[in-house]
Amino acid sequence: MINVRNTSRRALLAGVSASVFTGACASFFQTGDDTGNSELRRETLRTMKRAARFMRERVAYRGGYVWSYAADFSRRWGEMEAYPTMIWMQPPGTATVGHLYLDCFHATRDEFYYQAAMDVAEGLIAAQHPAGGWNYLHDFAGEESTRRWYETIGKSGWRLEEFHHYYGNATFDDAGTSEASQFLLRLYLERRSSRLREPLERAVRFVLDSQYENGGWPQRFPRVDGEVEYAPYITFNDAVADENIKFLLMVYHTLGDERALAAIRKAMEIFPATQQPAPQAGWSLQHHHETLAPMGARTYEPLSLATHTTAGNIAQMMDFYQWTGERRFIERVPEALAWLDGLRLRDDQVQVQGRQYPTFIELETNRARINHRRGSNSGSGEYYWNYDVRRPITHYSQWRALNVDALRERYNRLASENRDALLARSPLNAQANFRLPRFFTTDTIDVSDLNSTVGAGTTERPTGERVMELNSSLNAEGYWPTPLTATSNPYAGEPPAAASEGDFAQTLVGDRFDTSPYVTQTPVTGISTAAFIQNMSSLLLSVDSGE
């Protein structure tokens, strides 16, 4: 699963001056680096337009996108195989492409890209739930087609339990709602189009209406009968609160909406409220929405405390101290750090190099709960946990790499910093002439697409040699041919009751009835939305005029 956005949008949360976001990255064509001549710039602009036109005219379906496509469009995938009438919300999906088009518009001032971004907005508006959020995917063929997909392909993805049932509501999971909301806000601010105002307001209301009085947010909203037990739990997993707070900060600073500021202040309260007593002073992936007790979720997310969630929440608590100057937000940070220190594995205990902290920690005993599975598909298979570190599942990390020392250093630094200086830089203060970052897709973006390394790090301004390579590698049709290393089994019908022969305990996919994506050793060449985003992000930096 995913945690989206860092760098400049993370800086937004830290209260960095707005001037950080308005500075431009000069292109090498202006600075004279490498082979930055005017002809290469013109060629690069042509490459960008050809690639964008192909995606807009040949690949998009009603303005939206999935993650990858067979070259002949015979198959296509989001996190799972998709119907031709579907678009995908999780990054790097529809809204990510919308951000890219808007980034290209900022870099080139070419109206083509603004109109392409508006096409994406139309797709998102059509896919928007009446409550204001988005599901993982949307099928323009209608509810019957959507339900058929969930009852076949979705239900058959053994390790993707979130797709086993369709509830007809929206989700905060995997940042799909957050990214779509941020994109609509960015695009609205460009020209204040009346077409976007009401969908944007619905997106804002979705975040506000779904927030509990205690400040937390559920994974899914609105509540529906029959949904999985964990759907209403307060969710820290996949940075749900972090993403919502970021969006609300953007709304507050750009639209002056005081509702957003009130919701941010309320959201901060759920973090200290759910921190567990010492000596286990951590957090769970999710907590009960009424009792605030730690809770489990998917069958490979057992009732436990989670070390990576704890590290993330420690960082958030320190953010809140920076924003408010209220020491109550950091007074129990040392307890949480001490708990993590006690969980660090000795070198001879490490199972995965570089990962020294077990993911799931049992309440009271402090023992690591390790997840396993048996069977061969979603029908015959099951997940279970025990304390045995041998043969764990591999699709969900059972150990984490955490930089606890860096958290402690930050705490010590903040504890001695002048409170007035912190408050002066707080993002909770209204800022005159505030502007969002010019570019979004050049930031770090973590995604679930197995085909992609897009967003693995901040995109750097490319060399002239790299620009020429990208220009020349765009094929005659207008896309960058990409090995589709992720694939999936086509839906093969209901699985038999008995498990198939074979050992699937540590694989990404089970038998032929399992529709979960996996990495193939014989990839076909196709069209990758992530590759399009990554390559275009590099090229737009090379031609950016800084205006």
What residues fall within each predicted segment?
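Active-site/pore-lining binding-face segments in mid-to-C-terminal subdomains
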Residues: 318-431
